[in-house]
Design a protein with these regions (language model features):
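The feature marks the mature, well-folded catalytic cores of soluble enzymes
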Residues: 1-163
Length: 163
């Protein structure tokens, strides 16, 4: 047993877009970032007091990792442009060499998670062509990170931590 709260959404999931992406939002203390036209009603209701940021990418969480103090890393140029307009600190990286089985490549949000003040990474930034950019960004914002294995970045869809 955990003390983790959970909610049931109203969107009937399927393998088809946009239903498959209805829950793929990024939520911070202040923001809800998603393609708002497809966001599940439950998420909208839970985020009623947050600033809503609309992006064209339905797979927002797959493409974006939110870090403290309005810092973000994304593999989507459209998301980067929208966040820069609200004066967020955004690092864009190309996801061409992130592994996602059965797909051409993965996305940056799928191989990272932020929990308990630490950025957790599925793989090693040294094995990622744009890893040095991320290392410099993390150093600039003084953010610790843990690489979970010494190999290429692997898009596992994210990581979940239960307390």
């Amino acid at each position: 047993k955990t003390n983790t709260s959970y909610y049931f959404g109203t969107t009937k999931l399927s393998e088809n877009y946009p239903q498959i992406a209805a829950f793929n939002a990024v939520i911070t203390q202040e923001l809800l970032i998603h393609k708002l036209s497809i966001t599940d009603e439950c998420i909208e209701n839970l985020c009623v007091n947050k600033t809503k940021i609309n992006v064209n990418q339905g797979f927002t969480r797959c493409s974006l990792i939110a870090l403290p103090n309005n810092h973000f890393i994304t593999s989507d140029k459209g998301i980067a442009a929208v966040l820069e307009k609200i004066h967020a600190s955004v690092l864009y990286v190309d996801s061409f060499d992130i592994i996602l089985p059965a797909q051409k490549h993965g996305l940056i949000g799928g191989c990272m998670a932020f929990f308990d003040g630490i950025l957790w990474i599925i793989g090693s930034l040294h094995a990622f062509k744009e890893g040095e950019k991320i290392l410099q960004f993390l150093k600039k914002i003084n953010l610790p990170f843990i690489e979970l294995y010494n190999g290429p970045l692997w898009d596992g869809g994210s990581l979940f931590f239960l307390q």
